[in-house]
């Protein structure tokens, strides 16, 4: 399904989830900020792909598709594709670790304020780049 309406919904929901990221940041729940930021980025980028008529893969990191389909994306986004792809890859690496941890690592003890701030900034930047191409964009 390549529905622009579905893509616009993803982008709208990504914007709404930024409030959750901010609430988690205020609660100093650093691991949850990282995890939720990854989900924001995933939704926003998959929304962008759908709006552009590109079926997103059912994986968490769509960076390779963004780069491969750069020419099909809105002109204003094309200049940001590399940084958007880097943000997607970066947060994807932390997706499970931030949520589940590992035998020798608890997420709350591993992630720091700086990690959370960086993840939140990636999420904000991604939504800001993608949002103009959502519900009322091109």
Give residue spans per PLM region:
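Terminal alpha-helical segments
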Residues: 1-138
């Amino acid at each position: 399904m390549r529905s622009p309406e579905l893509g616009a919904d993803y982008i709208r929901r990504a914007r709404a989830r930024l409030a959750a990221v901010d609430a988690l940041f205020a609660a100093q729940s650093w691991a949850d900020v990282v995890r939720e930021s990854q989900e924001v980025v995933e939704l926003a980028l998959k929304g962008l792909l759908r709006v552009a008529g590109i079926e997103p893969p059912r994986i968490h990191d769509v960076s390779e598709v963004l780069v491969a389909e750069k020419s099909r994306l809105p002109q204003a986004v094309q200049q940001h594709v590399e940084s958007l792809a880097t943000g997607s890859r970066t947060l994807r690496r932390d997706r499970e670790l931030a949520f589940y941890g590992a035998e020798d690592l608890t997420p709350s003890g591993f992630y720091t304020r700086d990690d959370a701030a960086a993840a939140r900034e990636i999420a904000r930047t991604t939504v800001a780049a993608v949002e103009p191409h959502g519900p009322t964009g091109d």
